[in-house]
Swiss-Prot record:
NAD-binding protein involved in the addition of a carboxymethylaminomethyl (cmnm) group at the wobble position (U34) of certain tRNAs, forming tRNA-cmnm(5)s(2)U34. It comes from Vibrio atlanticus (strain LGP32). Disulfide bonds: none annotated. Belongs to the MnmG family. This is tRNA uridine 5-carboxymethylaminomethyl modification enzyme MnmG. Gene3D superfamilies: FAD/NAD(P)-binding domain, GidA associated domain, C-terminal subdomain, tRNA uridine 5-carboxymethylaminomethyl modification enzyme MnmG/GidA. The gene is mnmG.
Length: 631
């Protein structure tokens, strides 16, 4: 049966990638259908109850700067907020929050149900309708056909999903949910490169069975940080602590004695797991010299007794899981309410994607989230937003858009995936970005909101707030530049008490703020340089921009040099075997990768600077270089 309404964009999957994709498409005015196997699981946190962290918090802020949902959802559902790396420089500071799962899911669903241009429908998708190498719709489990100009697949761990607990395995997309077998089979028939990955989750614990007096308490920050540029602390629910315990030699002995019952070590699981979130059995074997591992005990919400022991993800049999839990301090009598498990699933080589997340083989088909080999809610949300935006642009006949590596962590993410691919679940870190001093959490809106407004993603309220902040920053910097003090001023003693060395010559407010010992709040506490801005986001920007001005300018200069050929287009029909001087290896890699630009080609493993020079000469010879791209 053909559904009566044709949509502009169909999004398959209602997780963190799917919700952002559907909302981005709908926000840009496209009629959008979100298909999910279960409407009650929209926005569900399948693994740990937390958002943010190093590199990840940066992605959340970028999603927010572009009008996305994740930051606002966690501001309304976060039960403990912390700034990580608070003592370090602003480039690597990151926000992280524990979430109340129920509050988070409820907030997401409420937004989805009340978004114009967005229709929700509960059905699993079994097939794609493809005509002349272009997707034109989907077929659901009960044979319903929905037609659209573009389809975004955000299917998480559901493609060919298999759950492992010990040597027992069963089909599943996650505990309690069926996998997508028919869709996985259909995608394997298409010309994509496919492989398997693995992830896992720990057993959940009943808090009433834990002796908290034996645990170390970990409180959140006070005052709490806020994720969204539109958020405020009044939106946050009641704050509660987390706790810390440790594994010990007894724990490790239990694990080592039962490795023959681990599906990972017995060769049952073929997929590679996440390097930066390994299972407890992996940690014990890889770090054999360590006799203890820190385990973070995270509450799952304000109205549940469930605890998430972050650090003991496992696929060992349930009886072994019980022994592991009971071996830890404070957990001697702990009751497990849900067993831990590993899940193996299909992913598709992201080198088969364009920078817009559109697949290279099927027009109008976009992939986002774990299907691309990533791990993490934040990475999924960032991909979902970009895929949804570009699906919308595709349906409008407009050129796609993706930020560059120097503009956003989102740009680093898709560039890494589409040029290098991945053999293990990909996680974002600040260390992956060359220009991280420019890609800070605090300036995500300055980097992305104006472009997002142009693309139709940002509403009037956010745009008004953004312009207000920019105006406040500009006025405050001008005020500090124009306010001077000299060593003979009457109020010089007040200033010298703050400075490490007394003033010897006249200085402006900006000159003083550049000094490492001077903060904006200290400076504006002085009568001459007060009052401070009430807009805290703007004052934070003023301080960072003034203090790091030289370093920021240096990175900007580096970027301008590297961008000279970054966007030089490579024709889609170029025959690299006809480019004289390229080695057979380079020809093969370029033909396989089909890079869109010189910048992308330069980051493919094995493509040398000499090969790039040969390509530029070829492009110039054939009149394919624009003015300013020569040499």
């Amino acid at each position: 049966m053909l559904y009566h309404e044709k949509f502009d964009v169909i999004v398959v999957g209602g997780g963190h990638a799917g919700t952002e994709a559907a909302l981005a498409s709908a926000r840009t005015g496209q009629s959008t259908l979100l298909l999910t196997h279960n409407i009650d699981t929209l926005g569900q946190m399948s693994c740990n109850p937390a958002i943010g962290g190093i590199g990840k918090g940066h992605l959340v802020k970028e999603v927010d700067a572009m009008g996305g949902l994740m930051a606002q959802a966690i501001d309304h559902a976060g039960i403990q907020f912390r700034t990580l790396n608070a003592s370090k420089g602003p480039a690597v500071r990151a926000t992280r929050a524990q979430a109340d799962r129920a509050l988070y899911k409820a907030f997401v669903r409420n937004v989805l149900e009340n978004t114009p241009n967005l229709t929700l429908f509960q059905q699993s998708v079994d097939d794609l309708i493809v005509e002349q190498d272009q997707v034109v719709g989907v077929v659901t489990q009960m044979g319903l056909k929905f037609r659209a100009n573009a389809v975004v697949l955000t299917v998480g761990t559901f493609l060919g999903g298999k759950i492992h607990i010990g040597m027992e395995s069963s089909s599943g997309g996650r505990a309690g949910d069926p996998p997508s077998i028919a869709l996985a089979d259909r995608l394997r028939d298409l010309p994509f490169r496919v492989d398997r990955l693995k992830t896992g989750t720990p057993p959940r614990i009943d808090a009433r069975s834990v002796d908290f007096s034996e645990l170390e308490v970990q409180h959140g920050d006070n005052p709490t940080p806020v994720f969204s540029f539109m958020g405020n602390r009044a939106q946050q629910p009641r704050q509660i602590p987390c706790y810390i315990t440790h594994t010990n030699e007894n724990t490790h002995d239990v694990i080592r004695a039962n490795l023959d019952r681990s599906p990972m070590y017995a060769g049952v699981i073929e997929g590679i797991g996440p390097r930066y979130c390994p299972s407890i059995e992996d940690k014990v074997m890889r770090f054999a010299d360590k006799n203890s591992h820190q385990i973070f005990i995270e509450p799952e919400g304000l109205t549940t007794h469930e605890l998430y022991p972050n650090g003991i993800s496992t696929s060992l049999p349930f009886d072994v899981q019980v022994k592991i839990v009971h071996s830890m301090k404070g957990f001697e009598n702990a009751h497990i309410v849900r067993p831990g498990y590993a899940i193996e699933y299909d992913f598709f080589d992201p080198r088969d994607l364009k920078l817009t997340y559109e697949t290279k083989f099927i027009k109008g088909l976009f992939f986002a989230g774990q299907i691309n080999g990533t791990t993490g809610y934040e990475e999924a949300a960032a991909q979902g937003l970009m895929a949804g935006l570009n699906a919308s642009l595709f349906t409008q006949g407009k050129e796609g858009w993706s930020p560059r590596r120097d503009q956003a962590y989102m740009g680093v993410l898709i560039d890494d995936l589409s040029t290098m691919g991945t053999k293990e679940p990909y996680r974002m870190f600040t260390s992956r970005a060359e220009y991280r001093l420019l890609l800070r959490e605090d300036n995500a809106d300055i980097r992305l909101t104006e472009k997002s407004r142009e693309l139709g993603l940002v509403d009037d309220a956010r745009w008004t707030r953004f312009n207000e902040k920019m105006e406040n920053m500009e006025k405050e910097r001008q005020r500090l530049k124009e306010t001077w003090i000299n060593p003979k001023s009457e109020d010089i003693d007040q200033l010298n008490q703050i400075l490490k060395t007394p003033m010897s010559r006249e200085a402006s407010g900006e000159d003083l703020l550049r000094r490492p010992e001077m903060t904006y709040s200290q400076l504006t506490s002085l009568d001459r340089f007060g009052p401070a801005l009430e807009d805290q986001q703007a004052s934070e920007q003023v301080e960072i921009q003034v203090k790091y001005d030289g370093y920021i300018q240096r990175q900007q200069d580096e970027i301008e040099k590297s961008l000279r050929h970054e966007n030089t287009k490579l024709p889609a029909d170029i025959d690299y075997s006809k480019v004289k001087g390229l080695s057979n290896e380079v020809v093969l890699k370029l033909t396989t990768a089909k890079p869109d630009s010189i910048g992308i080609a330069s980051r493919i493993s094995g493509i040398t600077p000499a090969a790039i020079s040969i390509l530029l000469v070829y492009l110039k010879k054939h009149g394919l270089l624009k003015k300013g791209e020569e040499a």
